[in-house]
Amino acid sequence: MSDELTSRVRADFERARFKAFLNRVRSVISRRPTTLLSYDEVKEKLRIGGPIYRGVQTIRVDEIVGSLNRYHQFDRAFLPTQNETSNRWQSVDRAFYEDVNLPPILLYKVGQVYFVVDGHHRVSVAREQGQEFIEAEVRECSTRVNITPDLKMEDLEILGNKVDFLERTALDDIRPDAHIRLTIPDGFDRMLEHIAVHRYFMGLDLKRDISDREAVDHWYETVYLPIVKVIRKSKILKEFPGKTEADLYLWVLDHQHYLAEKEGRPLQPPDKAARQFIKKKDE
């Protein structure tokens, strides 16, 4: 039985390595990286806090998407990418077949995803064996942005910009219901410019100094929301797969400024500018 089990766990590892090879080939063809997320890189970009101990929990294996320090040894599906992990991987796989109870793994939670601190091979074997859940000691790290299991490394730059935007505007505190998502790399920088310009003209209109919070709240209520409401009502977003309401908000204002500069048209109220953009799109 021992020889049979040894052969089985060796075959399991070789199969997992071959799957990792196929994933790598697909990633080259599709130009979509399959690497695990690096906790340190996420921490640096998103300036996350913590960690705070949350106890032992049962965690979905597919919500574990990154690693503290072994993100080069496994791919995004937690398949082993190096033969050096063979002995440890097969040892954990053997424990699976022998129904040995292993200690909980250690995870950092950030948003809706988890990063492995200790227990990479146990996660890898669990996924390969079709296990949906795993016991883990969880420590949660605070973040101002929501992170989901579909997060990619290339998304970090925009999310980092969003963190900077929220730290400078406190929009998530002023408007807890505001959930601005962007796919445009410089989108949040442009929104900061919009708020600064809005604050300037508010000061001229009201003949007084405008606080940061007042400017942010007024911009959101009188500029951003009116455009987004028109976008939602028109259902035009479905014509732009992969784009967001905030992306279209930027396009509406780009179109507005284009008409003003190239055709000399006067600037329109936000909601009218949005309807004008949609009408142009339908022509």
Predicted feature locations:
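Glycine-rich loops and low-complexity Gly/Arg-rich segments
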Residues: 89-90, 130-132, 140-143, 159-164, ...
